[in-house]
Amino acid sequence: EYYAGKYNIDPLILYSFIRTESNFNPNAQSNVGARGLMQITEETFDWIKLKIAPSEDLTFDDLYDPETNIRFGTYFVSYCLLRYHDDLATAAAAYHSGWGTVDNLLSQAEYSSDGETLDHYPYPQMRLYVRKITNSYQRYQDIYNEK
């Protein structure tokens, strides 16, 4: 929740990403080598490190540390949300498939009516991922708003 506050993100959004990416397993590793709670790839780790921790002696293996992983993952989610105008679904698509893919889709009227948010997802894996994130977020909102 510290990093949610630091980057001004609803913590429930972060829970949704962590649940979807690793089911809260800090030692998770994907078949493409993404690591930790928020399943960050080495390329993404290197990019984020330049942005938020250039002088820190961190390695890709440090992503197995929950605090480091959440710190880096939260920055990445916040960047995606900022880039895509706080639209969670489009930001989730970018987190999953990359900005290049999403930016390309945004330029096509069949996928985006406004050029800023995605209306449709052409790839089944992207569509499933976005649905998992948005459904998890809705469930967390329902649970925590009942209290």
What residue ranges belong to the model's regions?
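Catalytic glycan-binding domains that act on GlcNAc-containing polysaccharides
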Residues: 1-147
